[in-house]
Amino acid sequence: MRYGGWLIAAAMVAAPAAAKDRLGVYQSWAAFRDAETPRCYAIAAPEETVGSATRKAYLSIGFWPRSGVSHQIYVRLSRERSTNSVITLSAGGRRFRLKGEGSNGWATDRRMDLAIIAAMRSATSLSVESIGRDGRSIVDAYALRGAPSAIDAAALGCVPK
């Protein structure tokens, strides 16, 4: 699998040094469980990035059962964005304006999280776009092959036993 190394690297960046259980690798996506926190997440690295990346970008869907949080979208851009620029996620013909801080982006609320995931389930690719501090476009493109399976594995991985 072409993205295996990226997925593992992205997962390591996404989580503290706590032990993680790999729930599965699904084409360009993977699912992990961190039993100590506890939390589970589906994660992928971009298939393509426009321009030179200054950090490892990734997109994740997180589940935090103790906090009552599920299906939470999180994106880390490949470069630091301009303070005044928006972060736009596009999937399946739909566009979503994320809230952002630095190179990080989140859905504005649970309704948007679920709408993004619904769009992901019916699309083949997803892009996250913004403007970098240098004034150049940031475009991180993700393949969605395996995303539904990884999201489902992460959701099931955090169901209380």
Identify the residue ranges that each predicted region occupies:
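A generic "folded-domain core" signal
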Residues: A19-K161
